[in-house]
Amino acid sequence: MENAKTGTTTVGIVTKDGVVMGTEHRASMETFIAHKTAQKLYKLDYNIGMTTAGLVGDLQVLVRYMRAEINLYRIRRKMYMPVGAAATLLSNILNERKFFPYYVGLLVGGFDSKGYHVFAIDAAGGAIEDKYASVGSGSLFVYGVLEDRWKDDLSLDEGINLVIRGINAAMRRDAASGDGISVATITKDEGFVELSQEEVEKRMKKLKLK
């Protein structure tokens, strides 16, 4: 049986002050918009967040697995799991199922003693760290914005605006992406903090994206 095509747009970037992660809200099946407020941005722990693209059932199972393992790590070792360790754990879970895979594309981001990190992880468990990454059907449009505007000394505030710009570009051209934007920051001082929808809307108006 042929799998129904789904789509989404997710973004993660590293700034000098923290990590910014964002997604849009649309869940689709082929040309049908199945849901307009789908959650694709998750807090795994104080220092780690994850964005999800793919089949909802697979994504929700993986989020539960990761939260459980990360909580056990913190309880046993009295410390937060490093971001690289979380990416490796998720990579191993996916690789074990590579012949009967989870249909997902994931971003894991956050901070640890070595700094701020973003990892892109594919359905076969391939994990690549980069300063910025995008996963999903809208990623081609996002990368155009990121390549043009990302810089090494990007501030957290600039990073938030850049993620919003990137997702907005995808929503304009990718039919499988739309219906709003979720954004979260992950910093050493405040951990994982999701912006309110009012704040996102305010920034979009200030950037003249609405």
Curated annotation (Swiss-Prot):
Q: Where are the transmembrane segments?
A: none
Where it mainly occurs, coarsely classed, is cytoplasm
Q: Which reaction does it catalyse?
A: Cleavage of peptide bonds with very broad specificity
* Record localization: Cytoplasm
**By what means is the activity of this protein regulated?**
The formation of the proteasomal ATPase PAN-20S proteasome complex, via the docking of the C-termini of PAN into the intersubunit pockets in the alpha-rings, triggers opening of the gate for substrate entry. Interconversion between the open-gate and close-gate conformations leads to a dynamic regulation of the 20S proteasome proteolysis activity.
* Catalytic-site annotation from UniProt: T8 (nucleophile)
What HAMAP family does this protein's entry cite?
Proteasome_B_A
Q: How does it assemble?
A: The 20S proteasome core is composed of 14 alpha and 14 beta subunits that assemble into four stacked heptameric rings, resulting in a barrel-shaped structure. The two inner rings, each composed of seven catalytic beta subunits, are sandwiched by two outer rings, each composed of seven alpha subunits. The catalytic chamber with the active sites is on the inside of the barrel. Has a gated structure, the ends of the cylinder being occluded by the N-termini of the alpha-subunits. Is capped at one or both ends by the proteasome regulatory ATPase, PAN.
The family annotation for this protein states: Belongs to the peptidase T1B family.
Protein name stated in the entry:
Proteasome subunit beta
UniProt lists the gene as psmB
